[in-house]
Every structure is written in C-alpha cells, then in structure tokens.
C-alpha cells in the first residue's frame, strides 16, 4: 500500500479533492478538517477521552488495550461496516488520523484483514494542516487585485466569474455584513483556512496564474478571519471600484436578500417556519447595527421592516422593503464604505460600472 508523505503528495491530494476518511473523534474533526473529508471515527469523544486519561495514568500499552476493549463486538462491526462502505464508495480515497499514528494504522489493518487495501496519510491531519498553511503563505505572494464598491454593486458575482477569482465570502459562508449570514453554518477557523488554501491551490493549478482577483473584505467575514498572510497582502493591493447606479444596486439587493433568502428559508424549513426564520434573519441583521444607527432611527426602520414583512406576506411583493433599505444604504452603509475607501484612495486604480470593471479585470 503506497502512502502519501511528501509535500507535493499532500498538495496533489488537496487539488484533486481526494476523499479523506478521517478517523479522528468528532470533537477533533469539528475543530479543523480538510474540505473533502468525511468523519468516520475509530473512537467517539467519550472513548477518546477515556483512552487519553488511561494513557496519562498507565501508559501506552494500557491505553491501547482499553481502546480495543471499547471498540469491540457490535461497535467495532458497525464502524467497520461504515468504513467498508466509504472505501467502496470512494476507491480513490485515503485514511487520515491526527498524525498518521495508531488510529489510522489500526483502521487500515482491520480493512486489510477484510480484503480492502486502503492508503493512509503519513503525518495525518497535522501534515495536511501544515501544507495548507504553507500553501496560503506562498500563494498569497502573487499580485492581487481587489474588487471594491458599495453594497449591492455585484462584487461577489464579478469575482466568481473570473478564472483567477476566489470567492472569500462563499468559502466563509457569510456575506460579510450584518445581514451576511447564510443558511449554511460557518466552518471552524481552521476548516475555513483549509478550504481557502485548497481553493487557491486548485485555482493556481488550473492555469498559469499571474494574479488573484478577490473582493475587498475586512479582516473578519462573519466569525471567520482571513489568514494574516493574505490579509497583509490585501492591504497593499490595487483596488478596482464598481460604481453602479443606485437603482441597479437596489435590484440586486432585493434579489439577494429578500427574494432569494425567503426562498432559501422556506425551501429549508417549509412555508410557516421558513417565514419565521426569514423574518428573524432580517430583524437580527438590523438589530446588529442598532447602536450605530441610534435607538430612535433603529426603531423607525424596524417599524418599516415590520410593515414591509406584513405586505410581503399578504401580497408576495418585496417592494415595501425599500422603505427601510434605501435609508439604511444612504445613511449607514454607503457613508461607511466611502469613508473606508477614502483611507485607501491611493490604492484605487480603476473605477467604472460593473461591466467596465469586469472588462478591465479581464485584461489584466
């Protein structure tokens, strides 16, 4: 059985989206995992904790014996069935534990005894994690062009359409604003960084990449923060600013935050609960900036939001949301972005409407 153990092997594994059967405990997996990994643990959290305590108190032999005792009989058979099914479903996959130690070797030997030869990651998750960290540091050294612009200018779509674009918000599962959350929960910080590194590796491998196209983001995207090496490079990058008409921006925001989010919530939860989740999502977003709006203005806009939701529920129309969205943009979001842009005005190298910026970026 050929094991993966070189830096290039690790990178090739990530670029190919090689399925990884991660046999670490769920708590370890939740703290950080590779993008193509599925968690089929050798031991659950309680079993792992018991074995760890035994190791500290009685040594490795006693801990190993306890592990075999805990994962035996029906429990072992159930886990074997899950591993066997995963191996058959992912014949090009690979096993992984924390450091390429006993857990992945034990699972590998059990599978071998059952007639399945399956490789493992030498060095385990730790080696893969070091690879993603190093890859991000290296790839972030390439030139970067940032796409800037006020809310609703279609920056994310423009980035998505570039062959050298990386959608940071999509990877973070958050659109970066008070209303930015999606129905997908955000990943742990380590998992987000691993996903970002894998995406950068794949994008770089597809072409002779000269520069990155990224959205002009702050350090935080929801609960995830950008790796410091990338964030530092972004502060030095050139910026192309999208300046679309206000009416076009309103159309985009209506589609993205009202029509699409309502559809997504009702699709996920059903009509009744989905509507409640959608209402809560909008109210939570507005409440998040209450202090900056001031209590009086917040209460006024919250009342307009309630009225707009009542109208939307009765008629299906989202037009009434303009009564609170327009002042929110003009009084809060637009002035805030323009203030931020003024502080880095020397970095702005191009301004234009969406199509003009797209053409400019394409020519780089």
UniProtKB/Swiss-Prot annotation:
- UniProt-annotated catalytic positions: 97 (s-selanylcysteine intermediate)
Instruction: Extract the InterPro entries matched here.
Output: Rhodanese-like_dom, Rhodanese-like_dom_sf, SelU
Q: Which residues form a coiled coil?
A: none
Per its record, the protein catalyses: 5-methylaminomethyl-2-thiouridine(34) in tRNA + selenophosphate + (2E)-geranyl diphosphate + H2O + H(+) = 5-methylaminomethyl-2-selenouridine(34) in tRNA + (2E)-thiogeraniol + phosphate + diphosphate; 5-methylaminomethyl-2-thiouridine(34) in tRNA + (2E)-geranyl diphosphate = 5-methylaminomethyl-S-(2E)-geranyl-thiouridine(34) in tRNA + diphosphate; 5-methylaminomethyl-S-(2E)-geranyl-thiouridine(34) in tRNA + selenophosphate + H(+) = 5-methylaminomethyl-2-(Se-phospho)selenouridine(34) in tRNA + (2E)-thiogeraniol; 5-methylaminomethyl-2-(Se-phospho)selenouridine(34) in tRNA + H2O = 5-methylaminomethyl-2-selenouridine(34) in tRNA + phosphate
A single GO BP annotation from the record?
Answer: tRNA wobble uridine modification
EC number of the protein:
2.9.1.3
Q: Where is the Rhodanese domain?
A: 14-137
Q: Does the keyword Iron apply?
A: no
Quaternary organization: Monomer.
Q: Which gene encodes it?
A: selU
The entry's function note states:
Involved in the post-transcriptional modification of the uridine at the wobble position (U34) of tRNA(Lys), tRNA(Glu) and tRNA(Gln). Catalyzes the conversion of 2-thiouridine (S2U-RNA) to 2-selenouridine (Se2U-RNA). Acts in a two-step process involving geranylation of 2-thiouridine (S2U) to S-geranyl-2-thiouridine (geS2U) and subsequent selenation of the latter derivative to 2-selenouridine (Se2U) in the tRNA chain.
The record's similarity note reads: Belongs to the SelU family.
Q: Which Pfam families does this one have?
A: Rhodanese (PF00581)
Q: Which UniProt keywords apply?
A: Selenium, Transferase
What general EC class does the enzyme of this chain belong to? Answer: transferase
Q: Which N-terminal stretch is annotated as signal sequence?
A: none
Q: Cite a single GO MF annotation.
A: transferase activity, transferring alkyl or aryl (other than methyl) groups
Spell out the Gene3D superfamilies in the cross-references: Rhodanese-like domain
Give the protein name, as stated in the record: tRNA 2-selenouridine synthase
Q: Does the keyword Aminoacyl-tRNA synthetase apply?
A: no
């Amino acid at each position: 059985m050929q094991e993966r153990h070189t830096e290039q092997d690790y990178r090739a594994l990530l670029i190919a989206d090689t399925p990884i059967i991660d046999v670490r405990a769920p708590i370890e997996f939740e703290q950080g995992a590779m993008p193509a990994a599925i968690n089929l643990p050798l031991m659950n959290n309680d079993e792992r904790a018991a074995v760890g305590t035994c190791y500290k108190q009685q040594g490795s032999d006693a801990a190993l014996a306890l592990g075999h005792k805990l994962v035996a009989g029906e429990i072992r058979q159930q886990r074997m069935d899950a591993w066997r099914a995963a191996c058959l479903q992912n014949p090009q996959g690979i096993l992984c534990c924390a450091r390429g130690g006993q857990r992945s070797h034990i699972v590998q030997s059990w599978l071998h005894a059952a007639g399945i030869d399956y490789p493992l990651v030498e060095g385990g998750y730790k080696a893969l994690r070091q690879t993603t960290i190093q890859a991000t540091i290296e790839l972030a050294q390439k030139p970067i062009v940032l796409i800037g612009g006020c809310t609703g200018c279609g920056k994310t779509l423009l980035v998505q359409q570039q062959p050298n674009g990386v959608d940071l918000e999509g990877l973070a599962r958050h659109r970066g604003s008070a209303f930015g959350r999606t129905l997908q929960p955000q990943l742990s910080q380590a998992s987000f960084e691993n996903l970002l590194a894998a995406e950068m590796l794949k994008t770089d491998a597809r072409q002779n990449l000269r520069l990155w196209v990224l959205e002009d983001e702050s350090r935080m995207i929801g609960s995830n923060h950008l790796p410091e090496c990338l964030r530092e490079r972004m502060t030095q990058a050139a910026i192309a600013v999208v300046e679309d008409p206000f009416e076009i921006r309103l159309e985009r925001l209506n589609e993205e935050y009202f029509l699409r989010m309502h559809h997504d919530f009702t699709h996920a939860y059903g009509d009744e609960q989905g509507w409640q989740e959608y209402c809560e999502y909008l109210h939570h977003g507005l409440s998040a900036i209450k202090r900056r709006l001031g209590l009086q203005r917040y209460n006024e806009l919250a009342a307009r939001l309630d009225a707009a939701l009542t109208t939307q529920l009765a008629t299906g129309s989202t037009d009434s949301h303009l009564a609170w969205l327009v002042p929110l943009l003009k009084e809060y979001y637009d002035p805030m972005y323009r203030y931020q842009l003024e502080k880095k005005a020397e970095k702005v190298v191009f301004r234009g409407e969406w199509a003009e910026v797209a053409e400019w970026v394409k020519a780089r």
